[in-house]
Amino acid sequence: MKVVFMGTPDFSVGTLEALVEAGYEITGVVTQPDKPKGRGKQMMPTPVKEAAEKHGLPVYQPRRVRDAEAIEEIRKMEPDVIVVVAFGQIIPKEILDMPKYGCINVHASLLPAYRGAAPIQWAVMNGDEVSGVTTVSYTHLTLPT
């Protein structure tokens, strides 16, 4: 089964590692572009890019995943399934419709609580004693607000 993985922060790396260890054919890893960090503003890769490169996986870093060029590059990866974990951009319908078996999203909260960005931080700031992870299958996603 051909898997395209889309993720960016440390939270995403565990899922990517599990897919590699399970022996799935990962035809592409899509992550955010490198960004300047630290006092010297050196360009730094995302944690997902570092993990993908460690395993010799092909990495694609579009500035905007909804651009025609990005959609075509992901289409070339021929996904049977797309796994999304904290990617950080709205994924267009053209991409969500590509895989034969659909898309799976892993979100770091018990949805609908803390939908959108920074769900772990919001749970901590609000003093929640219970939190969790939600896994959902979808065919068209808009980034919740």
Q: Over which residues does each language-model region extend?
A:
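One-carbon transfer enzymes
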Residues: 1-141
